[in-house]
Amino acid sequence: MARVKRGTTTHAKHKRILGAAKGYYGRRKNTIRIARQAVEKAGQYAYRDRKVKKRSFRALWIQRINAAVRAEGLTYGVFMHGLKLAGIELDRKVLADIAMHEGEAFSGIIAQAKAALPEGARIAA
């Protein structure tokens, strides 16, 4: 049976790992063992932070909606309840964008949500 030499595949593998570690600090960029660990950890961070990114944006949208709604005398929770009662099915991303860029349109949405609320609903102080 013929002898199998793996120098080419090993070199390609090392080149791929060191390419992924390009720009890292210290031995992480040029020592294969340390670079492999750094690249693996970077992948773990990337995977985790793709999930965290969704949470962060949702929190940002809620903060923006809450700020715009409080200026009109409602709280975020009461406003969202009013939207549900009014049958307005806009998601938080769209609501935050409207609140940021189209203030008059958002005031109209707030008015509809207020009108749909039952009498005596809590209003922001």
From Swiss-Prot:
Q: Which gene encodes it?
A: rplT
Which Gene Ontology molecular-function terms are recorded? rRNA binding; structural constituent of ribosome
Chain coiled-coil ranges: none
Could you list this entry's UniProt keywords, alphabetically sorted. Answer: Ribonucleoprotein, Ribosomal protein, RNA-binding, rRNA-binding
Briefly state the protein's biological role: Binds directly to 23S ribosomal RNA and is necessary for the in vitro assembly process of the 50S ribosomal subunit. It is not involved in the protein synthesizing functions of that subunit.
UniProt GO cellular component terms: ribonucleoprotein complex; ribosome
Q: What is this protein called?
A: Large ribosomal subunit protein bL20
Family per UniProt?
A: Belongs to the bacterial ribosomal protein bL20 family.
The record's annotation in PANTHER family points to: 39S RIBOSOMAL PROTEIN L20 (PTHR10986)
Species this protein is from? Rhizorhabdus wittichii (strain DSM 6014 / CCUG 31198 / JCM 15750 / NBRC 105917 / EY 4224 / RW1)
